[in-house]
Every structure is written in structure tokens, then in C-alpha cells.
A protein has these predicted regions:
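Generic structural signal for well-ordered beta-strand positions
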Residues: 68-69, 131
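Sensory/regulatory domains in signal-transduction proteins
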Residues: 74-75, 79-154
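Intrinsically disordered, low-complexity terminal regulatory regions
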Residues: 1-68, 149-171
């Protein structure tokens, strides 16, 4: 079962990464044109949420992974995130190492304590210099259902449970 589940997770990640690649690349190009005007960047992020229906938050970071915009959400801008230093967050590791588009492993978000994924798109200037990063956060609970990706094995399967619970059930 474990390999089947892992294969399903890998397929889901590849599908999500493929879906995000074009959308985030286009949004990053638009942001590059407005760089570094905060108001114009935040307006573009708010508009970008319409192009990413399952995205929870969009934000921009400078080349040092310091947040240069508020978080854009469907409810508007969340100012408290402006200036946040994100270089040490696990989802930044691939991007800081040079990956043009990275998709994090699942993690529990630091503030909202929700299961999350973060995609990070690198943004380069016209001369190839690193301007910064576009971050897109997703709540795993809000992503489309994945039943088609994972089929439960047809045979009955018993999983080992907590002995204390099992003892209480079968007496």
C-alpha cells in the first residue's frame, strides 16, 4: 500500500507542478514589469489569484527572500506579512539553490497551522539578474479531490492500531 500511496502523491505533485508552471511563470513576468513598486505588485498579485483558483496566498520576496509585498488573499491584502524574512523556511531551499520553479513537500504552516504546499517561482530581470521570488501557498484541504489518483487495493487490509484503544473495543 505504501508504494501505491507514494506513487499517487508523486503523480499529484507532478500534475500540480505542471498546472502551476505556466500560471506562475506568466504572473512572474507581469510582476517583473512592475518591480519594485509595491502597490503595482500587490495589485497584480490580487488579480493573479483569479488565475490560480486553489491558491490561498500570493506574495513576492526580494533576492534575499525578504517579503516585499503583503500577502494577497481572496479577502484582500494581509499587511502583517510585509517584511517577513523567509530564507530559512524549508519551501525556499530549492528556489535559493537555483530551481526556476519548486514545489515544497507538504508541511504544517507556521501561523495558521494548516496542511500546506508552497510553490516558488524565481523572477529574473531583463539582464538575467535575480530580482526575487514569487510565492504561492496552497491549503492541502482545499485542493481538488484526488480520489482518481489513488485506488484503494481490492483486498482487505488490517492496519496495526493503538493497543489501548483495541483493548477497549474488544472487551
Amino acid at each position: 500500500m505504501k508504494s501505491t500511496l507514494q506513487e499517487s502523491i508523486d503523480r499529484q505533485r507532478n500534475i500540480l507542478k505542471g498546472w502551476l508552471a505556466t500560471s506562475l511563470s506568466l504572473l512572474a513576468q507581469d510582476c517583473k514589469q512592475a518591480w519594485p513598486q509595491r502597490g503595482a505588485l500587490e495589485a497584480r498579485l490580487i488579480a493573479g489569484l483569479a488565475e490560480l483558483p486553489y491558491c490561498k496566498y500570493l506574495y513576492l520576496l526580494d533576492a534575499n527572500a525578504q517579503q516585499i509585498t503583503a500577502n494577497a488573499s481572496r479577502a484582500g491584502l494581509i499587511e502583517s506579512y510585509y517584511g517577513r524574512e523567509r530564507s530559512h523556511r524549508p519551501y525556499m531551499a530549492e528556489a535559493l539553490a537555483g530551481s526556476p520553479l519548486s514545489l515544497s513537500d507538504a508541511y504544517i504552516s507556521q501561523n495558521a497551522r494548516r496542511p500546506s504546499l508552497t510553490a516558488v517561482q524565481v523572477i529574473h530581470g531583463d539582464k538575467g539578474e535575480l530580482l526575487g521570488y514569487l510565492g504561492a501557498d496552497f491549503d492541502l484541504r482545499e485542493l481538488p479531490a484526488t480520489q482518481a489518483l489513488y485506488q484503494q487495493p481490492g483486498q482487505w487490509l488490517q492496519l496495526k492500531g493503538d493497543p489501548a484503544i483495541r483493548a477497549g473495543l474488544f472487551h
